[in-house]
Amino acid sequence: MALYEHVFLARQDITPQQVDALVEQYKGVIEANGGKVGRVENWGLKSLTYRIKKNRKAHYVLMDIDAPAPAVHEVERQMRINEDVLRYMTIAVGKHEEGPSAMMQKRDRDDRPRRDGDRPDRGGFGDRGPRPDRGDRDDRPRRPREDRA
């Protein structure tokens, strides 16, 4: 059996419970055709780079699959039929990654509390002080005006 990573995008207006039901449905299809589903990661509702079928957001789901090719073809066929699935992509991999995916690591990193001031060696915009290379406008000599008559 071959190893696959499968990502699909579900419409924004379905609930997370309906997304979980889709995952269970596709798990059942894979297992019925002699395959196994390993890790399943729900990346949540994220903004799309561009609109897909009039949707600006989508639920992202990653599945690690160990199944024969006909099982994957059947899942893809059912995803084409289902109106709740906007896009899907299946990629054959040599081995499945251990631990959380890059998207989950990024989410964990973003959820961490920030340090005080974030960068103590740098201040905000207001603490720059006077610029020594530029004087005040009052220090400049005035240009003579030409009288127009």
Swiss-Prot record:
GO biological process terms held by the UniProt record: translation
GO molecular function terms listed in the Swiss-Prot or TrEMBL record: small ribosomal subunit rRNA binding; structural constituent of ribosome
Keywords: Ribonucleoprotein, Ribosomal protein, RNA-binding, rRNA-binding
Gene3D superfamilies xrefs: 3.30.70.60
UniProt signal peptide: none
InterPro entries: Ribosomal_bS6 (IPR000529), Ribosomal_bS6_sf (IPR035980), Ribosomal_S6_plastid/chlpt (IPR020814), Transl_elong_EF1B/ribsomal_bS6 (IPR014717)
Family matches, as CDD domains: bS6 (cd00473)
Region ranges (Disordered): 93-149
Biased composition (Basic and acidic residues): 94-149
Pfam families named in the record: Ribosomal_S6 (PF01250)
GO cellular component: cytosolic small ribosomal subunit
Disulfide bridge positions per record: none
NCBIfam families, per the entry: S6
Protein family: Belongs to the bacterial ribosomal protein bS6 family.
Record's function text: Binds together with bS18 to 16S ribosomal RNA.
PANTHER family, sorted: MITOCHONDRIAL 28S RIBOSOMAL PROTEIN S6, SMALL RIBOSOMAL SUBUNIT PROTEIN BS6M
Protein's name according to its UniProt entry: Small ribosomal subunit protein bS6
Organism (species): Rhizobium meliloti (strain 1021)
Gene that encodes the chain: rpsF
